[in-house]
Amino acid sequence: SLPSGGMDNRTAYTTGRYPGYSITNFAPFLQNSYDINDIFTLSGGVRYQWTENRVDDFVGYAQQQGIATGLANSADTIPGGKTDYDNFLFNAGILAHLTDRQQTWFNFSQGVELPDPGKYYGNGTYSLVGDHYQLQRSVNVADSRLEGIKVNSYELGWRYTGDSLRTQLAAYYSTSDKSIIINRSDMTINVQPDDRRIYGIEGAVDYFIADTDWSLGGNFNVIKSEVKQNGKWQKWDV
């Protein structure tokens, strides 16, 4: 009772904030590598990613509160449903064996940013008619399909593997050119141009103490994220 100040807390009502949903992914891929010579190795592949979203019917959060507090007795549901989208994703890289203990590499890969259905679907505008909430407009599966946002990533790295010392350093850069927003005027989901980038440097060092089970190590990651606004890159808070 100490956290509640000695009061006996009771649940008045329970509401849901977002519609229930499930996500199914299917992603077959092909990947291969080829040794050009003793120094260089090429690698590459392709992946097909298919995603299906199933969303439950849902009553708006504010309308659930209104029913729970007695302001209304019932409400229309925002219809659920299912939608799917797919992407072909590619990757390629080259690895160079500088010495028996040192390697450097450059990789390009594509990923897909999967939107959260609960963040977009289940939004609606209602009007109270008598003791019933009538649905006017809504963001629903039938009217607005989500799609994956493709992300291109690049990485340049180097590593050293010694008997006791192991270290690695890599620079990375990733870009995307779209984002998903809700148009509140007509309650639809829009995919709009939106240039964003994330880049940084990361590294790690490990030292294994001889004749013991102990090791010392450390790592770091310096990252910066930016979004293009009015033709200029600005800080992007993520």
Residue ranges: model-predicted function:
Residues 18, 28-30, 90-92, 144, ...:
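Membrane-embedded beta-strands of outer-membrane beta-barrel proteins
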Residues 97, 103-109, 119-122, 127-201:
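Membrane-embedded beta-barrel scaffold of Gram-negative outer-membrane proteins
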Residues 1-5, 54-63, 117-123, 130-131, ...:
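Outer-membrane beta-barrel translocator domains and adjoining extracellular loop/strand segments
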Residues 38-39, 164-180, 191-238:
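Gram-negative outer-membrane beta-barrel transporters
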Residues 1-102, 114, 129:
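Signature of Gram-negative outer-membrane beta-barrel scaffolds
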Residues 30-35, 40, 86, 94-97, ...:
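Residue-level signature of outer-membrane beta-barrel architecture
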Residues 1, 45-47, 107-109, 168-172, ...:
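Transmembrane beta-strands of outer-membrane beta-barrel proteins
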Residues 12-19, 31, 71-81, 139-144, ...:
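Extracellular loop and loop/strand-boundary signature of outer-membrane beta-barrel proteins
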